[in-house]
């Protein structure tokens, strides 16, 4: 049975095992600063908002972010959206994003920063109605070169 649920520091061992099992594919995130220590730190934050996608009891996808207070509402800054290689092309990442829209009425926007050379991710977010907002110049550094970030926003509540 497939399900989406909130994940927190109580799930940390499962999350770390999931990322280690997918270490080749997760290297991209490691290269831009998301190592296991950063993941552990993220799950200790009060404003952590993270979801897991489970097939049976196996974690196969994660959405990791921060809630940001915006007046009476909250925005979500999305840090990581990752699905195991064997489970890709099954719309799991889209289901995780849709969960936010259908189950969290307090979020007004979702923000994401994507390395400009990550064309697959850029296409994915645009397909899911994220709109380009601005560049962050030289935001990432990996493979001895600076990479700009493209920032995207998705409005959820258009009231």
Regions found by a protein language model. Name each.
Residues 2-4:
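Extreme N-terminal starter segment of soluble prokaryotic enzymes
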Residues 6-12, 16-88, 97-99, 103, ...:
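Acetyl-CoA-dependent GNAT
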Residues 70, 136-138:
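Short, Lys/Arg-rich nucleic-acid/phosphate-binding segment
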Residues 84-98, 115-123, 127-128:
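Conserved glycine-rich acetyl-CoA-binding loop
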Residues 103-114:
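Conserved GNAT acetyl-CoA-binding A-motif
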Residues 115-119, 138-159:
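C-terminal "cap" of GNAT-fold acetyltransferases
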Residues 126-136:
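Conserved acetyl-CoA-binding loop of GNAT-fold acetyltransferases
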């Amino acid at each position: 049975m497939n399900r989406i649920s909130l994940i927190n520091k109580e799930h940390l061992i499962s999350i770390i095992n999931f990322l280690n099992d997918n270490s080749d594919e997760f290297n991209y995130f490691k290269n831009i600063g998301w190592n296991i220590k950063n993941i552990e730190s993220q799950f200790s934050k009060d404003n952590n908002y993270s979801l897991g996608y489970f097939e049976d009891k196996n974690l196969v996808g994660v959405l990791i972010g921060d809630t940001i207070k915006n007046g009476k509402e909250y925005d979500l800054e999305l840090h990581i959206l990752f699905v195991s290689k064997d489970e890709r092309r099954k719309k799991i990442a889209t289901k995780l994003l849709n969960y936010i829209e259908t189950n969290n009425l307090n979020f007004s926007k979702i923000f994401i920063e994507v390395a400009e050379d990550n064309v697959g991710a850029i296409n994915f977010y645009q397909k899911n109605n994220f709109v380009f907002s601005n560049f962050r110049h030289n935001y990432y550094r990996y493979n001895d070169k600076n990479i700009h970030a493209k920032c995207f926003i998705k409005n959820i509540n258009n009231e």
